[in-house]
Amino acid sequence: MEFIDYDKQYDVIVVGAGHAGCEAALAAARMGCETLLLTINLDAIALMSCNPAIGGSAKGHLVKEIDALGGEMGKNIDATGIQFRILNTRKGPAVRASRAQADKQLYRLRMKHVMEQQERLSLKQAEVTGIVVEDGEVRGVDTKVGVRYLGATVILTTGTFMRGLIHVGLTNYPGGRAGDLPSVGLSDQLRELGFAVGRLKTGTPARLDGRTIDFTRLEPQHGDDPPVPFSFSTERIDQPQVPCYIAYTNPRSHEIIRSGLDRSPLYAGVIEGIGPRYCPSIEDKVVRFPEKDRHQTFLEPEGRDTVEYYPSGLSTSLPIDIQWAFYRSIEGLERVEIMRPAYAIEYDYVDPIQLHASLETKLVRNLYHAGQINGTSGYEEAAGQGLMAGINAALRVRDKEPLILGRSEAYIGVMIDDLVTLGTREPYRMFTSRAEYRLLLREDNADLRLRERGHAVGLVPEGAYQRFLEKRERIGAELARLKGTKLLPSEADPDFLAAFSLTALQNALTYEQLLRRPDITYEELCRIDPRAAEVPPVVREQVEIQIKYQGYIERQLDQVERARKLEGTRVPAGFDYGALPGLSAEVREKLAKFRPDTLGQASRIQGVTPAAVGILSLALKARG
């Protein structure tokens, strides 16, 4: 097929307009690059294909980090959310996480509007069927209608669209998601270029008609009052909140599900792709946990102006008649109507072990991958990768070094390091347990960790940056004040001393020492320190956490410092592991396969022993 060259060349071309593509395109354009975003359907920009929510455990951390770096996801959910909650409030600050229900259509429309208003960003509807590669470098992309777009860099954010195949029972048909065509040809070309292309599977529940649900028999779940925003730039959430509802499956539901397993593509061997371990279908739960007589579901509204509800935790690929029966077996849903059937989808992905930490591919220069093409699941994981790919493509255009976030700097850094160091054979989801320095990587300090980095690359506007500097200065000043202000036993309020078992106090205590006690909060401190009441809540929170967890934080910082040497030692491209005496054949094979960029990455490859890392370290030192 002959292609017509488009009459404009771009710095960055982004393929796909899901959550990864949106962040990638916005980042590149905001950094001054002429950017083109190509998508199969312009009306599906930032569409929430599965649950109508942003955030959750570890995912909320990712959104905060995206926002701190100058991304859009946090602002978008703040403007379109309909219920906001902080999870794990009874646990420590490291695992507290923000989550919000979204108005699904408003979320999509606002993101599309933001992108349409962005300077240097062009949006076009087209299906990309291949990339243009010359001399090992990407030069542009080809589209189904015969137009070739040329660009200095290309970012693939294809989601579930590459050879997407939708399953409902034993019926299947091509699709990128329900209602959209798949992308055909692109993954075949990637395979021909030498990429290891695999197959994954995910699924989504049915969408239920809220008019046919008896909510009086369900338990409502309300959001926090007042709602806490995601973005560090959002002052408050003004829109009214909407409740979710809790329901449960029962033994009858499970009998119905078992009766349909012979027509389940999952259990009939029709689906080849590997599904998400931590988001199993309801038939998977029933089979794997036969001792459980019920499973919880949250009925989540898809928006204010729609009757559609999303039953979380009830994804399935069972036949439609089994879907009708088992959804209607749930109390409160006896008369429920399905508006959109549940389905599973198989799609191609590219093993992320073939990427550098910048998300540039090792096989084709200037080509970047982000989102589900890398084997991840989740909007937030995709958005974090998209943001980093967009930043690094723009930096490549400027001929600057890439921005690489370390495991001690961000959950985004943990995620990307996991992907490019270990690869994945199943959909990867972020968890706080994946981060070894999670006390340093809290939601509340994402701006303190990353605002400087976002400003340095040009994504954080000057006004937002100045507000951040003022906040940081106030935190430092308050920490110094508390350290230098003392409570004298002779002058202290006797009631305060009695309340906290301090009546026997003989020596003065600083306010810092008082606040370090687990039973004394900032609120309590206000009883004896009028100035504490004047401290803004965001400063107060940060100061209290830093004081109460100081010992733990210092220990983790020591661990980071010890690991820094490994992370900073680069392994040259094409390094000959076969020439290293002392390495076992297994270690040589793994190092040659994974091709780590740094000594730190090498140390995290399964089977590479500390002794092998030591040998490699000595060899690198000898090379100078």
From Swiss-Prot:
One of its GO terms (biological process) is tRNA wobble uridine modification. Its cofactor is FAD. SUPFAM superfamilies: FAD/NAD(P)-binding domain. Pfam families: GIDA (PF01134), GIDA_C_1st (PF21680), SAM_GIDA_C (PF13932). GO terms for cellular component: cytosol. Keywords: Cytoplasm, FAD, Flavoprotein, NAD, tRNA processing. FAD binds at G16, A17, G18, H19, A20, G21, V128, S183, Q372. NAD(+) binds at residues 275-289. The keyword NAD applies. GO terms for molecular function: flavin adenine dinucleotide binding. Gene3D superfamilies: FAD/NAD(P)-binding domain, GidA associated domain, C-terminal subdomain, tRNA uridine 5-carboxymethylaminomethyl modification enzyme MnmG/GidA. It is found in: Cytoplasm. InterPro entries: FAD/NAD-bd_sf, GIDA_C_N, MnmG, MnmG-rel, MnmG-rel_CS, MnmG_C, MnmG_C_subdom, MnmG_C_subdom_sf. It comes from the Bacteria. NAD-binding protein involved in the addition of a carboxymethylaminomethyl (cmnm) group at the wobble position (U34) of certain tRNAs, forming tRNA-cmnm(5)s(2)U34. Belongs to the MnmG family. Homodimer. Heterotetramer of two MnmE and two MnmG subunits. This is tRNA uridine 5-carboxymethylaminomethyl modification enzyme MnmG. The lineage of its organism: Bacteria, Pseudomonadati, Thermodesulfobacteriota, Desulfuromonadia, Geobacterales.
